[in-house]
Amino acid sequence: MLLVAVVVALLVAEGATRLLSGDGASGYAPLRTGRRDRQPINALGYRDLERVQPKPAGVRRLVCLGDSFTWGVGVLFDDAWPQRVERTLSRARGEHWEAVNLAEPGMNAVEQVSRLDSEGFGYGPDVVVLGWVLNDSEDDDAAEARRARDWAEQEGREPGAFEALWSRSALVRLVRARVHATLENRRRISGYRSMYADDYAGWKKAHQALVTMGGLCRARGVPFVVVIFPLFANPLDARYPFAEIHAKVAQAAGEAGARVVDLLPSYRKVDWRLLVVDGAADEHPNEIAHRIAAQAIARAMDDVVPRPAAPTRP
């Protein structure tokens, strides 16, 4: 009888799982951008319009540095935060602003300071804005890099015959997916935290990169802004696991002379699933997340680049 009861319970659970399993819709329809939507790519290979040097008279410029979050992976060019800030500042301040985007997917902090030094200042920036993502301190030996490689290998592995048979069960798939996601998330959290340990070589280099960028900007009288993005594949409320890392980066950037914009508070009341390109398949910020970021960044500009004085009446 016990065996029969167990079998019946499993069958009921299987049926319930199949009935209740939806398509995982979040209420947000992702905008799937193809290769043609990655345009424009300018003559220097950046995802940007052609920007002339030296800076034309009457133009104000942000030079934007970062990785795929700043480049705008998964969103249209006009939806990425640099272009949104460009439009917002031009409209709100009555000035001609350009956001020169020198970002590139996969760049880390050390590479970003090199690009600023070798190319960025040639555009005559009125402000330098660095989009900081938590993997900017990563190197090839990082635990998170190893976890990501392991995940990619696991996803590409062909299941065996027994595993394929069991995978036909919705209940088995559900349990396995939940267990796998829990274990992977624990590895992910541990991996990112290890990348900000005081003795971790990648963080030491990234910290020094912030100091160097701050010094380069200070020597030229150019304001430096560091924008800290959260990792969106996590609850963005009190359960967010990387708040201490945000604080550590903010302290380092502030000590380097930067105006810090931590975006985490801006996303606190938003379901993270509404902020990503395509759920767990692509956790880059979508156009909603870019819009929220641009609003926060544009507000911060008043602190570092004063608005033009209102014309006096005769």
Residue ranges: model-predicted function:
Residues 82, 86, 113-117, 207-210, ...:
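Extracytoplasmic/secreted envelope proteins and their assembly/folding machinery
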Residues 75-80, 106-110, 200-207, 240-243, ...:
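Soluble non-cytosolic domains of exported or imported proteins
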Residues 15-93, 116, 267-271, 277-280, ...:
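Membrane/wall-proximal cationic-aromatic binding patches
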Residues 14, 67, 112, 128, ...:
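Generic structural signal for small/hydrophobic residues in well-ordered secondary structure
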Residues 133-251, 255-258, 263-274, 298, ...:
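Serine-dependent acyl-ester chemistry module
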Residues 1-15:
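Hydrophobic membrane-insertion alpha-helices, especially the h-region
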Residues 61-63, 69-160:
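Conserved SGNH/GDSL esterase-like catalytic core that processes O-acyl groups on lipids
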Residues 12, 17, 259, 279-314:
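Histidine-centered active-site loop/cap adjacent to the catalytic His
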